[in-house]
């Protein structure tokens, strides 16, 4: 209580992680994309993959887009989020099954930003880490997410029931959460794979096809390490050398 006076009196014990931290996920993503661009990556936005095929004669992959464009590659990295199973299952007999799991958040005004000074987690359950209450790098307060399994892989809308659940569950940790200071709300989809874990690496029966699938929480924290690991795998596969 000395560290977090706003915590509920019903809290019996806590685990403090002094090395934990926060980032802005939007700015982090943009920064990584900028770094990729500097290193030669070319982005193709709004370019859906229609089909994948492997040419055994030269080991190359052929990618056909929904617009009819084609690409040829020696390796493919499958980081397609909730659609990663659909791409993987085109090329591998070991099937993946990804369920979109919606999480809804509420963002509170900076007037509530000092209510807590750490990211407050509840005990995790089978659907994830539960509702958290966290400061943001911009001085706001973030509450969420919910966890709702869906069939629609584009359902990123918020719901009245979901947002009510965010505030109700958040107040189990911090009873004084001021819902009237909510300035916006949003939702996203985690890619929850049936096996319950990340799927990272080269598909055994699809040489040159590398999965980064089923990356749900703590995917943001894991992303830099996953990126470095997969880069090493691909570099080894291509016998590539470091750039000067």
Residues of each region from the PLM?
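Structural motif
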Residues: 13-14, 75, 140-141, 208-210
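Flavin (FAD/FMN) cofactor-binding and adjacent substrate-gating region
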Residues: 1-45, 50-59, 64, 178, ...
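Flavin-dependent oxidoreductases
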Residues: 52-161, 168, 174-177
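Short, surface-exposed beta-strand/loop "edge" segments at domain boundaries and coil↔beta transitions
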Residues: 21-24, 70-72, 218-220
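C-terminal catalytic lobe of FAD-dependent flavoproteins
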Residues: 31, 128, 137-138, 149, ...
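Hydrophobic/aromatic beta-strand patches that form the interior of the parallel beta-sheet core
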Residues: 44, 77, 210-212
């Amino acid at each position: 209580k000395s560290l977090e006076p706003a915590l509920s009196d019903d809290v019996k014990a806590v685990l403090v992680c002094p090395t934990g931290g926060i980032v802005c996920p939007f700015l982090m993503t943009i920064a990584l994309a900028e770094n990729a661009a500097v290193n030669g990556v070319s982005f193709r936005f709004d370019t859906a993959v229609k089909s994948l095929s492997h040419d055994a004669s030269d080991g190359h992959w052929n990618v056909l887009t929904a617009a009819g464009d084609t690409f040829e590659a020696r390796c493919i990295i499958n980081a397609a989020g909730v659609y990663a199973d659909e791409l993987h299952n085109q090329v591998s007999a070991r099937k993946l099954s990804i369920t979109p799991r919606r999480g809804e958040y509420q963002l509170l005004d900076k007037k509530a930003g000092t209510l807590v000074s750490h990211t407050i987690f509840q005990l995790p359950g089978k659907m994830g880490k539960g509702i958290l209450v966290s400061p943001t790098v911009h001085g706001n307060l973030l509450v969420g997410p919910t966890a709702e399994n869906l069939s629609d892989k584009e359902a990123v809308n918020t719901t009245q029931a979901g947002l009510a659940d965010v505030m109700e569950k958040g107040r189990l940790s911090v009873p004084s959460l001021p819902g009237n200071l909510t300035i916006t709300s949003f939702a996203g989809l985690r890619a929850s794979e049936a096996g319950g874990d990340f799927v990272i690496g080269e598909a055994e029966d699809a040489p040159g096809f590398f999965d980064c699938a089923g990356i749900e929480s703590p995917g943001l924290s894991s992303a830099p390490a996953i990126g470095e690991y997969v880069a090493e795998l691909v570099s080894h596969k291509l016998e590539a050398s470091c750039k000067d």
